[in-house]
Curated annotation (Swiss-Prot):
Compartmental location: Cytoplasm
Protein name in UniProt: ATP phosphoribosyltransferase
Organism listed in the record: Halorhodospira halophila (strain DSM 244 / SL1) (Ectothiorhodospira halophila (strain DSM 244 / SL1))
Record pathway: Amino-acid biosynthesis; L-histidine biosynthesis; L-histidine from 5-phospho-alpha-D-ribose 1-diphosphate: step 1/9
Subunit structure, interactors included: Heteromultimer composed of HisG and HisZ subunits.
This protein's encoding gene: hisG
Reaction catalysis annotation: 1-(5-phospho-beta-D-ribosyl)-ATP + diphosphate = 5-phospho-alpha-D-ribose 1-diphosphate + ATP
GO BP field: L-histidine biosynthetic process
Family membership noted in the UniProt record: Belongs to the ATP phosphoribosyltransferase family. Short subfamily.
EC number: 2.4.2.17
GO function term, MF aspect, one: ATP phosphoribosyltransferase activity
Domain notes: Lacks the C-terminal regulatory region which is replaced by HisZ.
Disulfide bonds: none
Record-level GO cellular component terms: cytoplasm
Length: 214
């Protein structure tokens, strides 16, 4: 019997938008991942299972062989880095923008801005590319709170509709990059199971194209 392929996914929007693509490939979870407490979920195919992990951990599980492939946002992949990853397909799901945001008038002039974000590497890279010095403050959530309590002048975060920013008196100021979710593959797994993984990669790419044209 062939080895089971493991696909790492995170709960939330990525999972919600990946499941229809898997269904187009003939892969259905054996139970609802959102309702289940299980972290490893079988599918209707004996050779494919799902691994439910935190979004920021998807590339780590794939890089270190805990999963053969996964779905992660471009933001997570760029922040993570890593040489053991191959990202052959932009699935075009969970689209949003990585933005600099803050008070509508911008940061106070004449001093180095304090920037709250969980994307420390990408934020530092963005400001350095503009020749701007910034103090980066690492947070894991509720970025919008930092300017409200005077802890930061700006935030770098993912923005979809912008409703949360507006509700907290903030505005998008600069777009760093558009974001969508990509299929990411363990390079070693691709060498040991090229036919099976290659077929699944091609099927998911075709499903993503079909979604865009439907």
């Amino acid at each position: 019997m062939s080895r089971t392929l493991t696909l790492a996914l995170s709960k939330g929007r990525i999972l919600e938008e990946t499941l229809p693509l898997l269904a187009r490939c003939g892969i259905e979870p054996a139970e609802d991942p959102d309702a289940s407490r299980k972290l490893i979920i079988g599918t209707n195919r004996e050779d494919v299972r799902l691994l439910v992990v935190r979004a920021s951990d998807v590339p780590t599980y794939v890089e270190h062989g805990g999963a053969d492939l996964g779905v992660a946002g471009r933001d997570v992949l760029l922040e993570h880095g890593g040489d053991g990853l191959y990202d052959p397909v932009d699935l075009g799901i969970a689209r949003c923008r990585l933005m600099v945001a803050g008070p509508p008038d911008g940061p106070p002039p004449g001093r180095r801005p304090r920037v709250a974000t969980k994307f420390v590497h990408l934020a530092r890279q963005h400001f350095a590319a503009q020749g701007r010095q910034a103090e980066i403050i690492k947070l894991y959530g509720s970025m919008e709170l930092a300017p409200l309590v005077g802890m930061a002048d700006l935030i770098v975060d993912l923005v979809d509709t912008g409703n949360t920013l507006r509700a907290n008196g903030l505005a998008p100021l600069e777009e760093i990059m558009p974001i969508s979710s990509r299929l990411v593959v363990n390079k070693a797994s691709l060498k040991t199971s090229p036919d099976r993984l290659g077929t699944l990669i091609d099927d998911l790419a075709a499903a993503a194209r079909a979604k865009d044209t439907s």
